[in-house]
């Protein structure tokens, strides 16, 4: 089996939290959110290397205030870009020989070992895979005037989570394409779809939340008790 690399994107600001520090550094039960995220990947036996992506102005803070407190097994810290896709591009360019790459939101601190292992398995089989859950609410499509125009079948909808998992050569090819053609994307599965490739969607977990709002933080505090 080839090498498996996880890329942890920790570039989120804490504006919606009303916090002075970036959301990945907000503490839950005495430990920053990024601690729980990194530990989840460190504890997976199939992960060979962890790359952490941080904004340029937060790398020194992490090295000074966070890293000395914990025994992280980070292979390297990469400077993020202006947009999420730029940060992923920078990380991919820092990887040498690699078979599978997992791209994960640093604020998703409660990803399970099963999701990580399933992502590796399915990306090896299909080339690209991502976890997801069925939306709990009915989803509506509205027009520019604000009126509902359609109600998609909820059974066919998936709220996609991370880690999004790929064969390295495939996602690298996709990122080169969107970089060269200046295409804006919202996640990495979209990049693979732009290549005309399919993404296998497997079962995620409602606990695998992205901690973004104060309400999410309350739920996160419950998870770590």
Swiss-Prot record:
Keywords: Isoprene biosynthesis, Nucleotidyltransferase, Transferase. Signal peptide: none annotated. Transmembrane segments: none annotated. Pathway: Isoprenoid biosynthesis; isopentenyl diphosphate biosynthesis via DXP pathway; isopentenyl diphosphate from 1-deoxy-D-xylulose 5-phosphate: step 2/6. Gene3D superfamilies: Spore Coat Polysaccharide Biosynthesis Protein SpsA, Chain A. PROSITE patterns: ISPD (PS01295). GO terms for molecular function: 2-C-methyl-D-erythritol 4-phosphate cytidylyltransferase activity. Its EC number is 2.7.7.60. It holds the Pfam family IspD. Catalyzes the formation of 4-diphosphocytidyl-2-C-methyl-D-erythritol from CTP and 2-C-methyl-D-erythritol 4-phosphate (MEP). This is 2-C-methyl-D-erythritol 4-phosphate cytidylyltransferase. The gene is ispD.
